């Protein structure tokens, strides 16, 4: 029987078993660390069906646990851990800040941020790590600008966010507690002295009007800050790797920048860094030739769904001309990633400027030597050394 989670050993290829899962059955039986059974969901049509099914819950007390250290967050609840209607109420309070129109107003600021980072990067002696010197500073500056979080605190919250995302690490809960305490203090400061950032606006328009509690705002500020910089940084780094492994595509994007939006969606589909979403059934669900029983755990394999040949054709290849907008890299349904429009814009601006300004960019290490992150639900690599 399959044991979950499964380690990934390649920076660009999925585990070979994923293709086998899609071919074998509607659902694949698996077990977690303590032997508890769960189901792996690997096919595109089934992933989408379950992510919109009201009989599937995100309640962390009912989901499969991935280690002895993996608890229910000790009462911590962001909107990502709540079912409707509570999830719906909270999401509506933040959704307008992440609309396509609102995010587009951030383009000049993001372009300014990326240009400044590239100026500093190009002043360094190569080889240079793309994650440390481009992707992470970019995503962190952007989310700090949006939320109104002091950028000078970045080392503190970057380290805690990374640790808090690791469900099998004993340091995860202490890191989460420190993040909550940090955002609690920041929200209290903004309550006394409101500003125009997203958190300050939420204080003025939501908290002080009684539409959201202090703790609800703090918990969702933790979510927005942590998810807002870590995921984008990893996705940008992997995207740079992929374009360097496909120099003809990088050249095509330099010559035809109008192709970048579709290239971004293909990169999202190709990598699908947020994999293995955990869910549980609250009632019996018939899916294909299987019946999921009430109480059964579910592991939703987004990356497998995004490589389903029945939906995407030659699923293992990277092709920026592929219609890829319907991928599920951001999830699907009511809990689909709130910041997807911002993530797309960050990728579009960062990748476009990087490959236009540094056309001679190349890898400074063997691809097979790249160190893949383990033990985290957010896939990535530890560093990406480049030269020019």
From Swiss-Prot:
Which residues constitute the signal peptide according to the record? none
Q: What does the UniProt keyword field contain? A: Antibiotic biosynthesis, Heme, Iron, Metal-binding, Monooxygenase, NADP, Oxidoreductase
Q: What happens when the gene is disrupted?
A: Cells lacking this gene accumulate protomycinolide IV and mycinamicin VIII.
UniProt: heme binding residues: 87, 91, 279, 335, 337
**Cofactor(s) demanded:** heme
Against InterPro entries, the record matches this protein to: Cyt_P450, Cyt_P450_B, Cyt_P450_CS, Cyt_P450_sf
Q: Does the keyword Lyase apply?
A: no
Q: What is its pathway?
A: Antibiotic biosynthesis; mycinamicin biosynthesis
Q: What is its EC number?
A: 1.14.-.-
The question of whether Transport is a record keyword is answered with no
User: What GO biological process terms are annotated to this protein in UniProt?
Assistant: antibiotic biosynthetic process
An example of a GO molecular function for this protein is: monooxygenase activity
Q: Which family does the record claim for this protein? A: Belongs to the cytochrome P450 family.
- Known function: Involved in the biosynthesis of mycinamicin, a 16-membered macrolide antibiotic. Catalyzes hydroxylation at the C21 methyl group of mycinamicin VIII, the earliest macrolide form in the postpolyketide synthase tailoring pathway, leading to mycinamicin VII. Uses ferredoxin MycCII in electron transfer for catalysis.
Q: What protein does this entry describe?
A: Mycinamicin VIII C21 methyl hydroxylase
């Amino acid at each position: 029987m399959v044991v979950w989670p499964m380690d990934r050993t390649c920076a660009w290829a999925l585990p070979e078993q994923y293709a086998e899962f899609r071919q074998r059955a509607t659902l694949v039986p698996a077990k977690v660390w303590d032997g508890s059974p769960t189901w792996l969901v690997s096919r595109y049509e089934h992933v989408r069906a379950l992510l919109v099914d009201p009989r599937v819950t995100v309640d962390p007390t009912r989901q499969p646990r991935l280690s002895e250290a993996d608890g229910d967050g000790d009462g911590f609840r962001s909107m990502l851990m709540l079912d409707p209607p509570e999830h719906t109420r909270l999401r509506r309070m933040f959704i307008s800040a992440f609309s396509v129109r609102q995010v587009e107003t951030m383009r000049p600021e993001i372009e300014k941020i990326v240009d400044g980072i590239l100026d500093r990067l190009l002043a360094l002696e190569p080889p240079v790590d793309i994650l440390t010197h481009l992707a992470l500073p970019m995503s962190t500056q952007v989310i700090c600008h949006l939320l109104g979080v002091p950028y000078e605190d970045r080392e503190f919250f970057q380290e805690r966010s990374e640790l808090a995302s690791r469900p099998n690490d004993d340091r995860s809960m202490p890191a989460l507690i420190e993040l909550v305490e940090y955002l609690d203090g920041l929200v209290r400061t903004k309550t006394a002295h409101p500003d125009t950032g997203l958190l300050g606006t939420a204080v003025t328009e939501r908290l002080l009007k009684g539409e959201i509690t202090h703790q609800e705002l703090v918990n969702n500020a933790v979510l927005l800050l942590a998810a807002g910089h870590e995921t984008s940084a990893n996705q940008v780094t992997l995207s740079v790797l992929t374009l360097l492994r496909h120099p003809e595509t990088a050249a095509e994007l330099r010559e035809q920048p109008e192709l970048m939006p579709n290239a971004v969606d293909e990169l999202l589909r190709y990598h699908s860094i947020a994999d293995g979403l955990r869910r549980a059934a609250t009632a019996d669900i018939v899916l294909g030739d299987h019946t999921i029983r009430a109480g059964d755990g579910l592991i939703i394999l987004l990356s497998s769904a995004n490589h389903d040949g029945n939906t995407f054709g030659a699923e293992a290849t990277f092709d920026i001309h592929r219609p890829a907008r319907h991928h599920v890299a951001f999830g699907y349904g009511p809990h689909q990633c709130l910041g997807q429009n911002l993530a797309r814009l960050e990728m579009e601006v960062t990748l476009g400027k990087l490959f236009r300004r540094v056309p001679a960019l190349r890898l400074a290490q063997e691809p097979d030597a790249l160190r893949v992150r383990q033990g985290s639900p957010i896939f990535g690599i530890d560093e990406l050394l480049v030269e020019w």
